[in-house]
Amino acid sequence: MKEKVNVTGVPETMVQTLYARAKETRKKNAKINDEIAEELVKNLDYDFSKADKDKAMNYGVIARTIVLDRMVEQYLEKNANTIVINIACGLDTRCYRMKGKYLHWYNIDLPETMKIRRQFLAETGPIYQIAKSAMDDSYIDDIDYHCENVLVIIEGLTMYLCEKEIRKIFSIIEKSFQEVTVMVETMSPFVVNHVKEKSIEGSNAKFTWGVKNGKELQRIVPEFSVQQEVSLVEGMKELMPVYHVIGKIPIVRNISNKIIVMEKHG
């Protein structure tokens, strides 16, 4: 029997991005392999019709998955015994694709979101679940931390927040860990103000915040330094070969979402 899912607003985006990964996995020449997402979609009682028609959302999710999977895997290969904190995890399954490459993995999201995750994914170690907001500093108490290296992933969240909330999230991270790297997805202000994704608008979630680049983000969270910026154009190149050409155009790279790598050293 399929499980009914009732979500609206920003939490609903987790179901739509899950569908995008499952849909790509089913393709003959799939660029990602997310069998867990495929299985979850089969067991969800949810109308995926808007997500299925939203090509922009689908391409964006897969491009982001390609880029972040690559970046996280490379990081974990260089940094043994890392604690990974996945903020606003939704129904993300990267922890399974990276299994065996980290010490502990903590999936964090709002209680109503984690209630849905627990229906389908029982995680009891080395993958753990924390049902709290990333702006609630008590989530740190649920992390078994003894000065290990920490990687924080913030994917698909910042564009729904405001600058004050961004500062709060980074402040908690900065105060809690001695050595920490943050991989955060950001959206350009142009896209926030002028672009609408059909499935996102249908969920009543709205884009509200963006930054042009890492330097702009560093001005907001000066305790961190920018180490790297990777445009999601790099993922689009694997989905649409034309991006090998148009991806060189500055405006295309500038308005594409980015993964910005920030570091704080003790």
Features from the language model and the residues they span:
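Short, glycine-/aromatic-enriched active-site segment of Class I SAM-dependent methyltransferases
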Residues: 189-205
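Rossmann-like AdoMet
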Residues: 1-85, 89-132, 146
